[in-house]
Amino acid sequence: MRLIFSLLLLVGCTVQAAEPVQSFTDDLGRVVNVPLHPQRIVSLHDLDITIPLIELGVPPVASHGRTRPDGSHFLRSGVLLTGVDFDNSNMTYIGTADIDIEAIVAAKPDLIITEPSRNTPIEQLEKIAPTGQHRSS
């Protein structure tokens, strides 16, 4: 949660041409340089990252989610806690267990927030956008 709040402090209302960056240490002790005002956040965990971002007024442009038996996608507890889900927002579904790297690239993120249980190597995510890891408590 500390990472999410730290990143939210960096989120601003405007984007400048040459976006300044700020360094912080993520929950795994890595120093990460992130945009001072990220506008296009991708979340790699629905309940631990996406829901808190939505609750704080910073919905991600794309998120990990779950799949129903009928094949439709949803945010775990999303409707219950926030009223937000993939079918009533502009948020893009990027996968469940296996994350769709092409969908992340297509979302054009300026910040990716992941957590240690994701199968996607952080080195691969860092080639797309600055990536911070959040360890859920």
Residue ranges and their predicted role:
Residues 64, 121-137:
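Charged, glycine-enriched surface loops/patches
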Residues 101, 105-114, 130:
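Proline-aspartate-enriched helix->loop->beta-strand connector
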Residues 11-17, 134-137:
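Short, intrinsically disordered, charge-balanced linker/junction segments flanking boundaries
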Residues 35-38, 50-54, 101, 105, ...:
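Extracytoplasmic/secreted envelope proteins and their assembly/folding machinery
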Residues 47-101:
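A short, structured surface patch at a secondary-structure boundary
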Residues 3-5, 13-51:
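Bacterial Sec-exported substrate-binding components of ABC uptake systems
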Residues 39, 92, 110:
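Conserved acidic residues
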Residues 44-45, 114-116:
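Short His-Asn-centered micro-motif
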